[in-house]
Amino acid sequence: DFLNFYLKRLEPNGIGMLSLDMPGIGYAEHWPLVQDTSRLHQAVLHYLSEVAWVDHQRIAMVGFRLAGNVAARLAFIEPFKLKTVVCVGAGVNQVFTNQELFAKCPRMMRDSLANRLGADAAQWDGMRTKCQVFSLKTQGLLGTRTSVPILSIGHKRDFICPEQDVRALAAASRNGKAIVFDKQPLLEVYDKALDEIVEWLKQHLCT
């Protein structure tokens, strides 16, 4: 999906892409998922400033779901290294702090989180307690403001990123924008979200 996104949407607009695995999966499986969810990506962000052929004044980060948590976190703690951030359906607060929303997590998501945390997926109450630290509001970030413009995209019926979180994320940034979809089919919404992402990146990176 990300290769197609790059080839069909980013490359034609002169935008490069570097894709990173989240801690606990893929090539980053030896990195445990901890409260500092962004430490791996932050290290890469610092490294890019030393790469001669990368314009470190025009770096953006796009994150989907839990990766949106990482992108949003870096918008707050690395405002001078990011030109803009895009978060899509990002789990940033309520899914980790609201017991009813956390209980909606499907089994596959529970197993994935447990694996990254080194926890037992069957011990759901313990899992919920451990995951509360991933809330950017609990961390004291969401509720402050960042100078990095954030495009926050979500769906009205998404339990991982409720509309309130979508709008709170955009409101916490300078010239941020919230887009909340409310229609089916999801594939159509997904394509529209990709269109919005590209236009946002062009606006902030190519002008």
Placement of each model-derived feature along the sequence:
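Catalytic active-site module of serine/aspartate enzymes centered on a nucleophile-bearing elbow/loop
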Residues: 182-183, 187-207
